[in-house]
Amino acid sequence: MQGVGSFSSPRVTDLNGDGIGDIILGSGRQEFQACDSAIIALNGLNGEMLWNVSAQDQIFGSASLKDINNDGIKDVIINGRSAELQAIDGRNGTVIWKFDKKTRYQNKARKWFNFYNPQFIPDQNDDGHEDILITNGGDVMVEAFDPNRPAGNLMIIDAQSGKIISLAPMPDGKETYMSVSACKNFDSDEYAIILGTGGETIGGSLFLTYVSDVLKGDISNAIPLATSQTNGFTAPPVWVDVTEDSIPDIVANAGDGRLLAFNGKGHEPIWAVTMKDTEAYSSISVGHFTEDNIPDFFVSYAQGSWPNLEWAKQFMVNGKNGKIEFTDSLGYLQLTTPVAADLNSDYRDEAILNMNFQQIDSIYRKSFYNILVAFDFKTNKLIPLTESLPGHNITTTPWIGDIDGDNLLDIIYCHSTSEFQTYTFDGFQVNLLKTDIPIRKPIKWGAYMGSNYDGVY
């Protein structure tokens, strides 16, 4: 893809009915620049473009997929900067609806900011169709350390029309950058939501609230789970049972370099891990990395303090007790999230991560490269999965699964094509790697926010 870049992570579904999964991505140019290929669909068979859709700013989000027009093909709902939110017919790329940036709410004019990844929730307006839960926030025009920022909003949007059903400001009145995750409550039909506030330089909190409160337009009684005075909670959390009571618990990254676990029933802390001299802006990989049956966690944090973040540091944390079982420091800063699968049939998952590095030639010129690697926690070995390729990958999480139904692992990964710059929007490459690795069990965490794209393990 020439002249554009991507912060989006690939989603896969069959759009053209050939039985092979196709690839959906967001892309764009520099901030505030329009792009005619801001949303693209690529043929999974050969990489050719199936369709492209324009946007007024970067589409950095990762799509949610749902057949909203009842034609048997999943449609694409995807988000980006400057209040970009679109629903697109997956079959042909026709825009079903766009969020109207002039939308008033309760007869008041509003300023809309970035949308973050959408989630589907049960029907909220009695039209017989699921609706969209989504956050909007983050005023990029505010100076980095200015605490006076517009409050973010948690919204329910009609998936059929893009119209607002309800809107609730953040419970602490702060901004938000988090893609929320919702999970059915353990003792009712209610859906619980994890949301976060704050940013790179502004403290914030992690909250639990419910869809019914969002529908009322008031989440001021949200349950505070954790707070940081220095950094916010920006990375998507996960719902996963680590207490073996069949109730999903909550695991989340804090921007100040902590990994936190909370009981899904009583919401009390289970364990907390602090990674010194790091900050967390990526999400969490979930897998069975140790010998027991309790899911474990692999994270890649940024070393340093924003904006002076250059290197990455990786940790594997035992889900049973919060013990750090593995640590490494590999590569330059990247904000991608690892994915997980059993690559060698030893009944333990390996974590797959895109790693950035540089080389310096004889005239001290830097060249930037990336490589896909797997961490084998049973042998503590690092396994390269690809050759090194020119360019860096800052935020695009790989997708792993079976794209063509042959029961062998396929890997989709992206990176920029600029050999001499790390942050660039002048070209990126999408790769499909076909392996001979058999898939012996369902892959639960094979994409950003998991294989179902919803943050639920």
List each language-model region with its residue ranges.
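Beta-propeller-forming repeat regions
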Residues: 1-457
